[in-house]
Amino acid sequence: MILNVEVGFDDLNTTYQLRSQQPHDGQVQQQGSRNIPQLSLPMSPVARPIQRTTQILSHLQHTMSAHHPIPAAPWRSAFLSHVDKMESPTFMLSTLHHRGSSVTPRSRTVVYRGAWAEIPVNPKNQAPLNPSLYESDLLTITTDARMEKVPELSTDGEDIPQSGGGGPVEAVFWVVETKTQWRLRGRAYLLGQDIDDPSASHVRQEIEKHMRLKNNDDSGSWNWGKEITAHFGNLSPGMRGSFRNPPPGTKRDEKPAPGLGLGQKVEDLDDEIARRNFRVVVIVPEEVDQVDLSDPEDGRRWNYQLKDGSWEKTELWP
């Protein structure tokens, strides 16, 4: 018996096909306009074609989530407007630190680097940019892969060699200009140099759910690796050089490895050492709390929760 399955659809400006020509070939071949993960379907000689169909449909359901993204969050416009007013867009990022069987909170100040897929314009950035095709409700920061917070972004406290994560985080902004506090709780994902590889497909899929086409225009070509390089290029040479620092948290009297040292400036956007340590962190909010204290006699508070693919808004007492 021969099972033929053919599917065509657009996924982030990608059209590709799935075909099974033989019932026991063990793999679905993929063809497309960009590198996409291979779908391996190991089957025993007695496996029935319906099992193959079930696996293919499961894969399609996961991939098609990017074609039907989650609608824009009702808090998005106000949040972006408030952050734009900040003299320095910093916030507190809280994570969970695992040590043996104990879990303790960790917090640090980080710099907001814009919404994912909407990198802020920097005329000094020499990196090639993706076309402005998408918008999202996702926050971005940059970090060093050697930082202690990297394993804290995983679900189990284990280190993340490249792309991965999904651990719980909370981001807290105090916007003094509007006297508003924003707390965003959700999951954080680390994006490394392997982001276009099949091994990082689960990270891309989680983020793609929140990427919405602007004006239904998918005529351009958008690339994940290019977006990460653009974030690296948006940093100053001195900030890029910080990714050639000695390993954070190591003893000062330990001699750093060749090429590492403080105070370096990096002009080359493909600097091997700096890029090896550079990561983009994408925060996917699942709950947002907004407290407006601009009127001391009538404070306002709203809670937003992402449930079943849509946002629910509730007004609360502050």
Segments the model singles out, each with a brief description of its role:
Residues M1-P42:
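Intrinsically disordered, low-complexity basic segments at termini and long loops, enriched
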Residues S44-P318:
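Binding-site signature for planar aromatic cofactors or substrates
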